Amino acid sequence: MSASAVYVLDLKGKVLICRNYRGDVDMSEVEHFMPILMEKEEEGMLSPILAHGGVRFMWIKHNNLYLVATSKKNACVSLVFSFLYKVVQVFSEYFKELEEESIRDNFVIIYELLDELMDFGYPQTTDSKILQEYITQEGHKLETGAPRPPATVTNAVSWRSEGIKYRKNEVFLDVIESVNLLVSANGNVLRSEIVGSIKMRVFLSGMPELRLGLNDKVLFDNTGRGKSKSVELEDVKFHQCVRLSRFENDRTISFIPPDGEFELMSYRLNTHVKPLIWIESVIEKHSHSRIEYMIKAKSQFKRRSTANNVEIHIPVPNDADSPKFKTTVGSVKWVPENSEIVWSIKSFPGGKEYLMRAHFGLPSVEAEDKEGKPPISVKFEIPYFTTSGIQVRYLKIIEKSGYQALPWVRYITQNGDYQLRTQ
């Protein structure tokens, strides 16, 4: 069982648009939603599921709107919330910004979309590429003329239109890895993981098939343990265009890509990561007078790689003043509104070590610092480099017209949640 009705409300709880799918819940029930929401908010007991009598309200907030689904029976809550977020995504793709004004300006098309998105309370067509084939924003109505069945009915590829043409056929593939790291004050790595994704920008004519091969080191989490140097990917998620049956058989990533930009796959490695940029800090607080920092930054990756736009964010006391800085490289800036100093290094080659000193005055009367000190955080980007060692061995482009296409592959490693605690 799914939703009985779906509403879009403004911030005051006024109904902007609604669709009754099952007729088993009185449409005026939604009038109870906002009073219950405000009451729960005041009590500090706000929940994504609210109830009045036998009716459940499942809701999300987006910009200045509430999207609410009602149900009287046992609904599959995860399905309903997934549907509400999908509604936001589809509306945003149609109207750029989903807010009260765009709802008021597009009543006709929204009713058409709600009719296609859900049928008798069950999600139906939620792929915006399919919806855009026969619901156009320009006419605010269904396309007229000779009736044409949706691509899904004809077994065509729903995420790619036919007849696409480019003068220059190109594919850009980015392997992007974000490093999440937490280091304790005594230098122990408490948490480390790599979150990766393969993103593509496709400008290819016709209906091409692409085959992507990754290096032999890469294993997927259900292949069993391999050699000690292998890279075992976890939580692998593919775009819907990937032929999963082919992948299950021989690990070939084969697909007909959507046109333009999309994420082909994402993955995670819960593994010990050697900190790429290591920070050592010595902080000396002289009572009632000053605080001094000595920060050493060391790049722990190969010399042939370089980290770009490195930013080291060092927290300082709220009442610090009169800053003085000295550094062997880059620039240092005090950001008092964030209670931090930012050491910026435009280019940080591998195997290098740099030093920065900072001096702040402190007021003669100071409050006892009972709260824990915020950690040092680091931002960086290393091109032509992956922490996991994942590499693209080949990217084949096959199209019946036989045109030549240029594949471009790029690797980027960047910071995720990268923090080092201080003494």
Curated annotation (Swiss-Prot):
The modification N-acetylserine is found at residue 2. One of its GO terms (cellular component) is intracellular membrane-bounded organelle. The modification Phosphothreonine is found at residues 152, 154, 223. Its main location: Golgi. GO terms for biological process: endosome to melanosome transport; intracellular protein transport; melanosome assembly; melanosome organization; platelet dense granule organization; vesicle-mediated transport. Residues 168-421 form the MHD domain. InterPro entries: Adaptor_comp_med_subunit, AP2_Mu_C_sf, AP_mu_sigma_su, Clathrin_mu, Clathrin_mu_CS, Longin-like_dom_sf, MHD. One of its GO terms (molecular function) is clathrin adaptor activity. It is found in: Golgi apparatus; Cytoplasmic vesicle, Clathrin-coated vesicle membrane. PROSITE patterns: CLAT_ADAPTOR_M_1, CLAT_ADAPTOR_M_2, MHD. Keywords: Acetylation, Cytoplasmic vesicle, Golgi apparatus, Host-virus interaction, Membrane, Phosphoprotein, Protein transport, Transport. Phosphorylation of membrane-bound AP1M1/AP1M2 increases its affinity for sorting signals. It is a peripheral membrane protein. Belongs to the adaptor complexes medium subunit family. Subunit of clathrin-associated adaptor protein complex 1 that plays a role in protein sorting in the trans-Golgi network (TGN) and endosomes. The AP complexes mediate the recruitment of clathrin to membranes and the recognition of sorting signals within the cytosolic tails of transmembrane cargo molecules. Adaptor protein complex 1 (AP-1) is a heterotetramer composed of two large adaptins (gamma-type subunit AP1G1 and beta-type subunit AP1B1), a medium adaptin (mu-type subunit AP1M1 or AP1M2) and a small adaptin (sigma-type subunit AP1S1 or AP1S2 or AP1S3). Interacts with MARCHF11. Associates with the AP1(MU)-Nef-MHC-I complex; this complex is required for MHC-I internalization. This is AP-1 complex subunit mu-1. It comes from Homo sapiens (Human).
